Amino acid sequence: MPKLLTSLLIAALLAPAATAQAGWSSEIVSPTGEQGRLVYVSDAEGNRVPEFSRAGYGGGGVPLPDVPTVETVGPAEGDDTASIQAALDAVAARAPDANGIRGAVELAAGTYNVSGTLRLRESGVVLRGAGDGEDPATDTILRRSGENQEPVVLVGRPEASQGAAIIRRDGGRRTATIRDEVVEIGAVSFDVDDADLYAAGDEIVVFHPATIGWINAVDGGGTASDARWAVGDMPIAYARTLLSVEGPTVTLDAPLYARLVRSVSPSYIYLRNRTDVIEDVGVEALRIDIETQSSSDESQARNAVVLTLVENGWVRGVTALHFWHAGVSVQNSRYVTVEDSRALEPHSLVTGERRYNFEVVQSQLILFQGNEASDARHAYVGNGETLDSGIVFLDNTSRDASTSSEAHRRWGQGFLFDNHVEIGSRGTGSSDRRIHLGNRGDFGTGHGWSCANCVVWNAQMNGALVVVEKPPTAQNYAIGVQGTASNRGPFLSTTAPYIEGTNRSGLEPRSLYLRQVRDRQLPVANEGDGVGRLRLLPPRPNPSSGATQFGFELASRAEARLAIYDVLGREVALAVEGPFGAGRHTATLPEGALAPGLYLARLSVGAISRAAPFTVLR
């Protein structure tokens, strides 16, 4: 059973028993709502614990798919790079099925010499081994030798991923300015000018410029002796899908992790360019062993696995050894899960820009679950400044780290360290911190306030230190830490973070993320339209040259109708109609059902509807 599904089932089964025990709940996040939903309390500034449930594959709470094998490769004498790549290319050339899946390349147990980089460049392709253990009789071992510093496995199209590719603009439509004076943390809806320029299903960016007003509000970035942050350099931006447009109000598929104040920085939305994004790609059950000359060598592969410009991707059951930067690096990506994987024994000097075992860079809504890091500097880290947000680290372990897991620099937002376990602490001074949510001053290149609206929840620190500090205009939280939680970082000692329940066992819920996923998936009662949450997922693939699949979610049982309209507003096809229970459903239009052109899928339940555009190719 997939790991996330297992965790959700365990959480659901344990919930009644846990409620009956003598546990405790936070004063600002408590399961006291209807059906045990979490209730959040905001402070006087409007800060509150964020909602993280959309992190991970499929937007959170969705099991990873089991992709069928369509190509099999065994080890051979000499270099195996070409034979594995040929199999990957053969699968990439296949037509995707209705779910966008092409198939998996399965590497039989054995040792493979890989001098080059294995590249997954098309959607729906998976690279899978037999296991990530040490025994070539039962496991798949990729051995990289030589001085090639390129990644061993590269998922995505790096030539299209330069700069801030996750928020690349499509110039086809004008921007729409956000009207609200304040958009609160956790908001999914707000009003905009020119809302009629946009439609349900559009991929957009919510853009908050780094104005002089904002930089002043955050104390110039809190950079100590380094220069203040510069106007225009660090926009806060969120890649989102529009679920609905009703009058001036737009509704997003995931919440925001910063408070947008119009008088400080007028924010706006624009259409996102998703060219070269690939989806439904994964790396599974492999051991990547990078050979080096010594434990301080840096001539070998910088990273073991890199995902770049990927959505709805995953890394599962992979062990990476002896990289010098990252075992898994997720870059310019969204809705990715990395689970049950290990990034161990990096070989490098122990200094800056090295040993970031599990890393995100300019990525959003990413879930790391059940992983293990060893000998890191920054074991679990965000390295993409203001473009990192909605990053969840759940049930992970760090052994023998030399410094902290953290959002590393320049206003990463919405990081959650949920049931983190630290082993092998080297001290409890401010320089020995093992999780840090706060100010990094003049470390690096003016790192300053590295983290805003971030949470440590129920961490088991085993003698290591959590440092949490309050940034201007935001808050950071340490709730239920088993260990030492301090508000005194390496640069400041006078901030007022939220620290609660240190060394108090029995925090409920055990996992903030899993409870938030559960809450989101519960039926929504007493909405005026009687429907509750109604969501139409983006059609896939889009554009389509074959079958097109539509997904939708209902919060409660309802009569639903999914129809297809042409550009003249005429109904040209009916995908599905009838009663459906609560949950996620799919419908498929077969190849040839529609002529080439632009169409609109509209899901209707009573008087409420959601729509998404899609294109059919020849």
Question: What does each of the following model-derived ranges do?
Answer:
Residues 124, 129, 202, 210-239, 243-244, 279-369, ...:
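Right-handed parallel beta-helix
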